[in-house]
Amino acid sequence: MTVDRAPRITDGDTRLSFGSNLSSFSEYLRVHAPEHLPQNRFADTGGVVMGGGDVAPHGTTIVAISYAGGVLLAGDRRATMGNLIASRDVQKVYVTDDYSAAGIAGTAGIAIELVRLFAVELEHYEKIEGVPLTFDGKANRLSSMVRGNLGAAMQGLAVVPLLVGYDLDAVDPSRAGRIVSYDVVGGRYEERAGYHAVGSGSLFAKSALKKLYSPGIDEDTALRFAVEALYDAADDDSATGGPDLTRGIYPTAVTITSAGAVELSTAKAAEIAREIVAARTATASPEGESAL
């Protein structure tokens, strides 16, 4: 009796009988074009530590806040290279699919490639399987991709993403916004405090959010808190850029609800930033003096 060898389904992934993972685009690259994976761009350095902070732009700071019915991710725009400002308008927050977004901290070039590859990974999975990954599945996929960058991280070119998303399988839709952080070796951690931050200014951003945040806040309040946290981080961390009213450069943000992921408009970001700067200026000005 002859048995046909057909693809089988294992743990939500389509695999051929010889073990090739059809639903993973990064696995496909690893087998057929490994030189295009972000972590393999530095495979020929002979193990020499490169001092990534001085040879490649680094991006910080990213904050995430969950609110009633959703979650948001926001980031500043500055990238630094050693003691220099490498860029003032870097995009650090990316929509990765309809219900998730990722922010990047660490070596900017590798981090941006990794997040873009992650977005392709999610799209590829949905095309092959016919259904999107669950939020836990997305978090696990990103974890394995960060782990794959360990070689570059050991050379000083670390990537630390922050993942947020709306969990369509959540029992309580008002608490469906989820935040997952990672370490440089790919460990994933669910952040249940309702907020989190990564990057060089994360200590100051989290300290600000600790005083501001309360469960059940609405989206507009969460957006204001995120920009305030980035403002406070920029006040104490030279690698974090605050709102630049002169150049018209403001933090970027993505909000995610049951309706999907939406990028914050520049006009809205400018409005929030100007309100915060005006309020801080008025508070700091001596009584009777003009804030201007």
From Swiss-Prot:
SUPFAM superfamilies: N-terminal nucleophile aminohydrolases (Ntn hydrolases) (SSF56235). It is found in: Cytoplasm. Its EC number is 3.4.25.1. Its main location: cytoplasm. It catalyses: Cleavage of peptide bonds with very broad specificity. Disulfide bonds: none annotated. The formation of the proteasomal ATPase ARC-20S proteasome complex, likely via the docking of the C-termini of ARC into the intersubunit pockets in the alpha-rings, may trigger opening of the gate for substrate entry. Interconversion between the open-gate and close-gate conformations leads to a dynamic regulation of the 20S proteasome proteolysis activity. Pathway: Protein degradation; proteasomal Pup-dependent pathway. The keyword Cytoplasm applies. It holds the Pfam family Proteasome. One of its GO terms (molecular function) is endopeptidase activity. GO terms for cellular component: cytoplasm; proteasome core complex, beta-subunit complex. One of its GO terms (biological process) is modification-dependent protein catabolic process. Residues 1-59 form a propeptide. The active site is at residue 60. Belongs to the peptidase T1B family. PANTHER family: ATP-DEPENDENT PROTEASE SUBUNIT HSLV, METALLOPROTEASE TLDD. HAMAP family: Proteasome_B_B. The 20S proteasome core is composed of 14 alpha and 14 beta subunits that assemble into four stacked heptameric rings, resulting in a barrel-shaped structure. The two inner rings, each composed of seven catalytic beta subunits, are sandwiched by two outer rings, each composed of seven alpha subunits. All four combinations of alpha- and beta-subunits (beta2-alpha1, beta2-alpha2, beta1-alpha2 and beta1-alpha1) yield fully assembled and proteolytically active proteasomes. The catalytic chamber with the active sites is on the inside of the barrel. This is Proteasome subunit beta 2. It comes from Rhodococcus erythropolis.
